[in-house]
From Swiss-Prot:
Segments forming domain BPTI/Kunitz inhibitor: 37-85
Name the record gives this protein: Kunitz-type U15-theraphotoxin-Hhn1i
Tissue: Expressed by the venom gland.
A GO term for molecular function: serine-type endopeptidase inhibitor activity
Disulfide bond is among the record's keywords: yes
PROSITE patterns named in the record: BPTI_KUNITZ_2
Listed PANTHER family: EPPIN (PTHR46751), WAP FOUR-DISULFIDE CORE DOMAIN PROTEIN 6A (PTHR46751:SF1)
Site description Reactive bond for chymotrypsin, residues in chain: 47-48
First and last residue of the signal peptide: 1-27
One of the record's GO cellular component terms: extracellular region
Keywords of the record: Disulfide bond, Protease inhibitor, Secreted, Serine protease inhibitor, Signal
UniProt lineage: Eukaryota, Metazoa, Ecdysozoa, Arthropoda, Chelicerata
Residues of the propeptide: 28-33
Length: 88
C-alpha cells in the first residue's frame, strides 16, 4: 500500500506541475520578469472572503481572495487593476 500511495502522490504532483508550469512561462517577459497581469487568478490558501479583481487578459474580473498566498494578479479595485494591466 505504501508504494501505491507514493505513486499516486508522484502522479498528482506531475499533473499539477504540467498545468502550472506553462502558465508561469507564458507570464514571463523576455528579460525574465514575470508580467503579473498574465498570471491566472489565485484565491490563495486561507478561507477568508475578500472580493478582489484580477486581469483576465481583457478586463478586470471579480474573484474571492482568501487573504493569504496567491499571486500578484490581485487588485482591490477595478480602477487599480485597469491602471496596472490595461494596455492603451
Amino acid at each position: 500500500m505504501g508504494t501505491a500511495r507514493f505513486l499516486r502522490a508522484v502522479l498528482l504532483l506531475s499533473v499539477l506541475l504540467m498545468v502550472t508550469f506553462p502558465a508561469l512561462l507564458s507570464a514571463e517577459h523576455h528579460d525574465g520578469r514575470v508580467d503579473i497581469c498574465r498570471l491566472p487568478s489565485d484565491s490563495g490558501d486561507c478561507l477568508r472572503f475578500f472580493e478582489m479583481r484580477y486581469f483576465d487578459g481583457t478586463t478586470c474580473t471579480k474573484f474571492v481572495y482568501g487573504g493569504y498566498g496567491g499571486n500578484d494578479n490581485r487588485f482591490p479595485t477595478e480602477k487599480a487593476c485597469m491602471k496596472r494591466c490595461a494596455k492603451a
